[in-house]
Regions:
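Helix-loop boundary and gating motifs at the non-cytosolic
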Residues: 2-60, 203-249
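C-terminal ends and interior cores of transmembrane alpha-helices
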Residues: 84-100, 280-292
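Transmembrane alpha-helix termini and helix-breaking/packing motifs in multi-pass membrane transporters
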Residues: 98, 154-172, 345-361
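Cytoplasmic helix-loop-helix junction between adjacent transmembrane helices
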Residues: 109-150
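C-terminal transmembrane helical hairpin of 12-TM major facilitator-type secondary transporters
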Residues: 272-313
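A late C-terminal transmembrane helix in Major Facilitator Superfamily
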Residues: 326-356
Length: 386
């Protein structure tokens, strides 16, 4: 691809980045926005947690069927349809809240909104292959990961600020921003198909694919255990709940730094590097589980955060080589679903067992997948792409 064509492709790629950054606004702002709505309607924030749970479970249920449903449509078209459906579901939540409808309707529409999240990510990630050379995918994914972390930092803050004015205003803003991918995502017809990605044919859910799904689930559970358990961690060390940011902010900043590092390096990691990164995440989780001191726990969260983007980038690149082009939306949807499954696992642990026990279980899971990758056959070690 010539320099001229790269320049031509920069505008569609920029639109893809905007779509990627705004795709997750409902997931990022939802916990805060839904909690404020639940508080205003029921007098308790627990309804907000029910809405998020419904959204997450629906995402897991809908990922594969919706990805398969859109297999014969252009990825951009299917993405627009999915995001439009989600926008209507979120708008329905706003209308129901405005008119004081039964709270069960809000939970139902939250599930409808979440139904498309996994598949939408699958189609959006597939589109990236149309706008970027294979050799530049690590950089593009690193940038996307960095923008995603920025979204998860800023969206809850914005939702909280708007909700203090009006919970409905927070919902309206979340719905509007979450609908942007349907407007700005570029059409695949606008850019020539990017070649250069090797593809391995065979079963879609091969042992290699399942291994990376397990790693994604474990990393999702590890991050969620810190984010969801942040308030409990602060209380555990005798601090006010507001100091939960002592754990979440370093986690997010370290993740942003990891995304920037991947963007600058622009290379697919070796399997040895991936094992080291997985081990670092397991060590970070172990430091938090030890419950020795706040400093040690913060160091653990930084270790988790700094390898989050490199690992996510590697999982995505590895799966690129393991599926036929027409099955990539399905595979990427399953990748996002695996991460969501990890979040559900961590949430369940924190609900039914103590914080320390939950962190021990998550550490054990992270250690198990680290050993699995370290001992896996060498065919899982894909060649670096410069």
């Amino acid at each position: 691809m010539t320099g001229t064509s790269l320049l031509t492709n920069s505008w569609p790629l920029l639109r893809w980045f905007v779509s990627s950054a705004t795709l997750t606004v409902p997931q990022a702002a939802g916990p805060v926005a839904f909690s404020f709505i639940a508080l205003s309607l029921t007098g308790s924030t627990s309804g907000g947690a029910a809405m998020i749970l419904a959204m997450t479970l629906a995402q897991i249920a809908g990922a594969v069927p919706l990805a398969r449903l859109g297999r014969n449509l252009p990825a951009a078209t299917m993405l627009r349809l999915l995001i439009s459906f989600r926008a209507m579901a979120l708008a329905s939540i706003t209308v129901c809240a405005a008119y004081g409808a039964s709270f069960e309707w809000l939970v139902l529409f939250a599930a409808a909104a979440g139904l498309v999240n996994g598949a939408a990510y699958g189609f959006l990630r597939t589109l990236l292959n149309h706008f970027v050379l294979a050799s530049r995918l690590p950089r593009a994914l690193g940038i996307a990961s960095t923008l995603n972390e920025v979204t998860f930092v800023l969206a809850p803050v914005a939702a909280s600020g708007l909700a203090t004015v009006s919970p409905l205003l927070a919902l309206l803003a979340m719905t509007t921003l979450g609908a942007l991918p349907a407007i700005v995502v570029p059409w695949t017809a606008a850019v020539a198909r990017v070649e250069g990605l090797p593809t391995l044919h065979g079963k879609l859910l091969s042992p290699e694919v399942l291994l990376w799904f397990a790693c994604a689930a474990a990393s999702g559970a590890t991050v969620a255990s810190i984010e969801i358990g942040a308030v409990a961690l602060a209380l555990n060390f005798g601090y006010e709940p507001a100091l939960a940011i002592t754990f979440t902010v370093p986690l997010c900043l370290a993740s942003v730094a990891g995304g920037i590092w991947i963007s600058v390096r622009n290379r697919m990691a070796s399997r040895t590097a991936v094992v080291v990164q997985l081990a670092a995440m397991a060590l970070g989780s172990a430091l938090a589980a030890v419950n020795h001191s706040m400093v040690m726990t913060v160091v653990g969260t930084v270790l988790i955060g700094v390898v989050l983007a490199p690992l996510g980038t590697y999982f995505s690149l590895a799966l690129d080589t393991l599926a036929p082009p027409e099955r990539r939306p399905e595979l990427f949807a399953l990748l996002r679903t695996s991460q969501a499954g990890g979040v559900v696992f961590a949430s369940a642990l924190l609900t039914f067992v103590s914080l320390s026990s939950a962190l021990v279980w998550v550490t054990a899971l992270m250690t198990a997948v680290t050993l699995a990758v370290a001992l896996a056959p060498t065919r899982l070690n894909f060649q670096n792409r410069a």
